[in-house]
């Protein structure tokens, strides 16, 4: 494979979109994804037009290795990247995972700041330069597409960073990534860093420079765009801004900023923005991380107008208060109410409007659940259907299933009778508690003993009215592992039981993963 040169991208006025939802995004505490969920997300990202999909950290676990390998086999139009440290064994493992694709990228990372070299690597600068030369050379001998990342680049000595970049370029790197690992830099500083490097680094014209920004100060998107102004032609980002600590630059925000403000940043991406909402909802469903209502681009209120003045302006001309349309990011143009008399064809059309394309079996199951919901609710709104489909997606790998729940609550106490299916075996328990939710969770604890602590229990109504569905989020922590579960139901206690069980299933999945002794924890 011949790597595309920066000149080719400049000619097309393109910015490469590098998605790291499955790698850096999954490092967000509790954001674990199953193997099948990663495969489905990879398909969504490919359909969206993402240039590079970072599918995992192959040496971190067998699960990551298999995810990278399978995604490399099924994705044909996007480059698949695997992350590795600057160790030969890491690089070899990454190359092995990428064998199934002609569009594979080995992504090598090592820290370059004085702080990291002294305290984390415990290496002298000259030794780090030697490791860069050897590791990138080895990676380039295995793949033509090699990305090199300078962890903590924005806090690195500029002259040493230049030396490190030149070493990586001479060794064969085709993309140079300068991460703002701890979200410390300021837009003007980041733009200047890229401008200076592209002008002063020998061989800079032979590579693509990349941004990778964390959101610790809320500047990840602004810094990414500033990096492009300074000369970067690749942005590393994640759906919904998912990532370590405060997260990464949000893919949907950087893409729409480039699209809407082409007058200031005359660069294009290959992203089909009508897939954005679908991707956002899918990631939210499988990770259990709700999208905040006022989140830019994909939040529930992103295109909502309540002020009378705003509503009047919108009725006269939408452009008075909207700089983009809901349709441009894949949101349904209307909130058509459906009910128990709606047929499967109307349901399928509604799902398509909402950005969901389900297979025949999944569609049949979803329609059955819709009809059940319609029997319990007078009106079924778009948000109800979204919650219904997302609830199914969030279940993932189910070792534990809720079969039956009966709760008795009154002034004289609360008790729950619960039946679960655990690894194919049906088990029943009765428990009391300080409130009905506590009783339900105690009943689950009796059937599935565990030491996980409840860190989050959150309920919100999907729509208005007393028959509205309740959407429940639960977060559990055990031995430093965090897992989240979501569920929706017209019965709040049933939704609570399902969400808790989903979190337990995800916690079990996380336990099966193991990380190498020196695995990167920073998400660089």
UniProtKB/Swiss-Prot annotation:
Its cofactor is Mn(2+). Keywords: Amino-acid biosynthesis, Branched-chain amino acid biosynthesis, Cytoplasm, Leucine biosynthesis, Manganese, Metal-binding, Transferase. Disulfide bonds: none annotated. InterPro entries: 2-IPM_HCS-like (IPR050073), 2-isopropylmalate_synth_dimer (IPR013709), AIPM/Hcit_synth_CS (IPR002034), Aldolase_TIM (IPR013785), LeuA/HCS_post-cat (IPR054691), LeuA_allosteric_dom_sf (IPR036230), LeuA_bact_synth (IPR005671), PYR_CT (IPR000891). PROSITE patterns: AIPM_HOMOCIT_SYNTH_2, PYR_CT. Its EC number is 2.3.3.13. One of its GO terms (biological process) is L-leucine biosynthetic process. It is found in: Cytoplasm. Residues 401-524 are annotated as: Regulatory domain. It comes from the Bacteria. Pathway: Amino-acid biosynthesis; L-leucine biosynthesis; L-leucine from 3-methyl-2-oxobutanoate: step 1/4. Catalyzes the condensation of the acetyl group of acetyl-CoA with 3-methyl-2-oxobutanoate (2-ketoisovalerate) to form 3-carboxy-3-hydroxy-4-methylpentanoate (2-isopropylmalate). This is 2-isopropylmalate synthase. It comes from Caulobacter sp. (strain K31).
